[in-house]
A protein has these predicted regions:
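Flexible, solvent-exposed loop segments that connect beta-strands
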Residues: 41-63, 88-113, 140-164
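Residues that define the transmembrane beta-barrel architecture of outer-membrane proteins
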Residues: 27-29, 65-71, 108-116, 130, ...
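Outer-membrane beta-barrel channels and translocator barrels
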Residues: 26, 78-82, 123-129, 174-176, ...
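Eukaryotic alpha-helical scaffold "rod" segments
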Residues: 25, 115-154
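Residues on the lipid-exposed face of transmembrane beta-strands in outer-membrane beta-barrel proteins
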Residues: 33-35, 69-77, 91, 116-122, ...
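Membrane-spanning beta-strand positions in outer-membrane beta-barrel proteins
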Residues: 30, 84, 129-133, 178, ...
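Bacterial Sec-dependent N-terminal signal peptides
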Residues: 1-27
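Short glycine/proline- and aromatic-enriched beta-strand/turn motifs that initiate or cap beta-hairpins
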Residues: 22-77, 196-198
Length: 199
């Protein structure tokens, strides 16, 4: 948490420092809805559920990995035409249904994991409605594991793991509303596509 607050403080200082570089400050909020593909946090369900002890003892495993496509919601504040700071929420879910080899008893493991990030967006090229930028962020994912086993009572476990965003190659085609694409890696996947709206 201390690192995240430090990151936000640095981002705000950069906003103030770069403000004099922009003659046309927008000072507006942006809202973004996006879809990512296989985010950094999606490895945890594979290791925890897919390679878990219950799965090793089971047969007829039905493993559903919804977070191959991860939805995200973002809000950011344009300090000027170069710098924006904001926050991001992504949601992931994975589940596995299985039968035990010994007696055919059925169990289920599920994991829900929201991710919160603090982001810094840096525009490095603008031409009309087209822009290129980099997006960098720090945050954490909270993993909620729910085990339903026929051999013991229902269990719920919580774990938080640090996350990052590193998207150096990003494109936007809007002035007020439009499409964006981000390439890199982090909590939003290796590719993130979405729609941006000026508020």
């Amino acid at each position: 948490m201390k690192k995240i607050l430090t990151f936000l403080a640095i981002a705000l200082v950069l906003c103030v420092g770069f403000k004099s570089l922009s003659a046309q400050d927008t000072n507006r909020w942006d809202a973004r809805l996006g879809v990512g593909f296989f985010g950094l946090q999606d490895f945890i369900p594979i290791l925890t559920i897919g390679l878990g002890e219950d799965i090793d003892r089971a047969t007829n495993v039905d493993f559903r990995f919804l977070p191959l496509i991860t939805p995200s919601f973002e809000m950011s504040y344009e300090c000027n035409k170069y710098i924006s700071v904001g926050g991001q929420l992504t949601l992931g879910y994975a589940t596995a249904k299985y039968e035990y080899i010994d007696d055919g008893a059925r169990g289920r493991s599920s994991m829900i994991y929201p991710t919160l990030m603090a982001n810094l967006k840096v525009n490095y090229l603008k031409s009309g409605s087209f822009s290129m930028y980099g997006l960098f962020g720090l945050g954490a994912s909270t993993f909620i594991l729910i085990d339903n086993s026929p051999y013991y009572s229902k269990e719920m476990n919580f774990t938080a793991i640090p996350m990052f965003n590193f998207y150096p190659l990003c494109f936007s085609t809007n002035k007020d509303n439009g499409f964006y694409m981000e390439v890199g890696y982090g909590s939003k996947g290796w590719l993130n596509l979405g729609w941006e709206m000026k508020l």
